[in-house]
Amino acid sequence: MASAVFEGTSLVNMFVRGCWVNGIRRLIVSRRGDEEEFFEIRTEWSDRSVLYLHRSFADLGRLCKRLRDAFPEDRSELARTPLRQGLLAIKGAHDIETRLNEVEKLLETVISMPCKYSRSEVVLTFFERSPLDQVLKNDNVHKIQPSFQSPVKISEIMRSNGFCLANTETIVIDHSIPNGKDQLLDADSTEHLFENGGEFTSELEDGDDPEAYVTNLSYYHLVPFETDILD
């Protein structure tokens, strides 16, 4: 499963003042056609700077899990927060607008928590810009494709004045991909709430070959591309 989040933070002595979810981007991240959904998040920081981030549903689940792990003595207090309910609401949303609203509510809950949590390294790391954010900021589809040798599609659903607007898709076709039913994979990334394969993690369907999956789209693969763009 793709992830935009990485360890460590340079945002010391800073905190998030506000965040808004602008829309969704979908990337095909494996040669079997697995599609990952990323929420585009606009964040305003305490120094008035603005960052545009891209986080998946799995990233949101990991954020909640890492908060619990970072403060084991406060598990009971964290359990009373609406974080888990927020994840379930996002997972159960059946339309784009509702899903975007639920993601925004969850993030507002996180940054509104006591400073002990909202300004912790876990939260600051989540909101720090990753190489994936840099790549998607430039809409450089061709920079992503070489890692997978697979079709890459970016489609955006952006919100404007309360409505969803579906923008034109950009599609890059790799003819080396064989045709056939193997390309039709119903991969629901929202089945994975926590990275440790917890209670919401679905098992691979019978007959699926785990080795057939391509390495996830992550910051490790995108670091070289960030350098290319900046050059």
Curated annotation (Swiss-Prot):
Superkingdom of origin: Eukaryota
Alphabetical list of InterPro entries matching this protein: PX_dom (IPR001683), PX_dom_sf (IPR036871), PXDC1 (IPR040288)
GO molecular function annotations of the record: phosphatidylinositol binding
Domain PX: from-to ranges: 1-134
Protein name per UniProt: PX domain-containing protein 1
Lineage: Eukaryota, Metazoa, Chordata, Craniata, Vertebrata
